[in-house]
Regions:
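Substrate-binding pocket helix/loop in short-chain dehydrogenase/reductase
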Residues: 104-105, 112-117, 316
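Conserved glycine-rich Rossmann-like NAD(P)H-binding loop of the short-chain dehydrogenase/reductase
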Residues: 37-52
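The beta1-alpha1 cofactor-binding region of Rossmann-like NAD(H)/NADP(H)-dependent oxidoreductases
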Residues: 46, 68-78, 110
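Active-site helix of classical SDR
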Residues: 128, 164
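Conserved glycine-rich cofactor-binding loop
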Residues: 21-22
Length: 333
């Protein structure tokens, strides 16, 4: 919600969402559409965007569709202008684009690493650079960055993805510092664990093996609901999922251990996984089947709860074990 004159708050009804054609972006568009108002939806796949927009219109929202690539700064600036003209103002901008490639760093071409950084970091910076002047002119606004668990700990087999998310985390922290003189402009970060979206189906794959997401896996609608809550009550950071909280706790104490555990787990999985073709995925072109919210990776609720518990206990036990095994520093050393 945005503060108006007199100190009261008005609902966020003018929303911009990038990466809105599937997954978390689509779920968030539909969640905001249920509240009415005006939505501006952007992504590379115009056809998939139109399908999402039609669903949102049926829910009662007015919708503008803008096909673009967030790595194109000029296109993003035009998106911001079009959104302001369509809505009259911009209450919340959800910077949601994310791509990636899975594989050992040296096995993935540098052009793929560069593309990942351009989309996941420069793309979000383009979003902020375009909308923050509008926020400052209207003296309010909420900018939401989709980061992920990858912004809290190193990600073996996804080095560029992890670098982009660490960079995005630092970028958000810097923006928050710069916005302190604007009390009604908020920079919010969302850190979900693994989410059941089509993203992994569309990722670049340089492992030669089939990809899957480790449990527990979040419903994209849960992440969307969290973004909607930020519209009502902005906060700096929002962590979602047991693995995220576990890593947030453990990483400051044992960053190297966490990375080694992750590398070992991925290595064991790929050693026995089914073979799959090497592909660049959707990094340079949108996939033909890019629509849909769900990726089809989730397990039944009982198994999800067990997996969540196992993840939390496993990380905590690893950190405790490391603490017991680490040699204590002696006085004077």
């Amino acid at each position: 919600m945005n503060k108006s004159r007199g100190g009261t708050r008005t609902p966020c009804t003018h929303i911009v969402i990038t990466g809105a054609s599937s997954g978390i972006g689509q779920a968030t568009a539909q969640a905001f559409a249920a509240r009415g108002g005006k939505l501006v939806l952007a992504a590379r796949d115009g056809e998939a965007l139109e399908a999402v927009a039609e669903t949102c219109r049926r829910a009662g929202a007015e919708v503008l569709v803008v096909p673009l690539d967030v790595a194109d700064a000029d296109a993003v600036r035009q998106l911001a202008r079009s959104a302001r003209d369509f809505c009259g103002s911009i209450d919340l901008w959800f910077s949601n684009v994310g791509v990636g490639a899975v594989g050992k760093f040296v096995d993935v071409p540098m052009e793929v690493h560069e593309r990942t950084i351009r989309s996941n970091l420069i793309g979000h910076m383009n979003d902020a650079h375009a909308v923050l002047p509008i926020f400052m002119a209207q003296r309010h606004g909420i900018f939401v960055n989709m980061i992920s668990l990858g912004g809290l700990a190193g990600t073996p087999y996804a080095a560029a993805y992890g670098a982009s998310k660490f960079g995005l985390r630092g970028f958000s922290e810097a923006l928050r510092a710069e916005m302190t003189e604007w009390p009604d402009i908020h920079i919010c970060d969302v850190y979900p664990a693994f989410v059941d979206t089509p993203a992994l189906h569309h990722a670049g794959n340089y492992t030669g093996k089939a990809l899957t997401a480790p449990p527990p896996i979040l419903d994209p609608r849960r992440v969307a609901a969290a973004v909607v809550r930020l519209a009502d009550r902005p906060r700096d950071s929002l962590l979602l999922g047991t693995p995220t909280w576990a890593v947030r706790f453990a990483h400051p104490f044992a960053p190297s251990l966490l990375s080694r555990i992750g590398n070992l787990a991925f290595g064991r999985y790929f050693a026995s996984a089914e073979r799959a073709p090497v592909t660049r995925g959707n990094l340079f072109d949108p996939p033909r089947d890019s629509g849909g919210i769900d990726g089809g990776f989730r397990k039944p609720a009982t198994k999800r709860r067990k997996a969540a518990l196992a993840t939390g206990v496993g990380v905590a036990a690893g950190v405790l074990l490391l603490g017991l095994l680490m040699p204590r520093r002696q006085p004077g050393r």
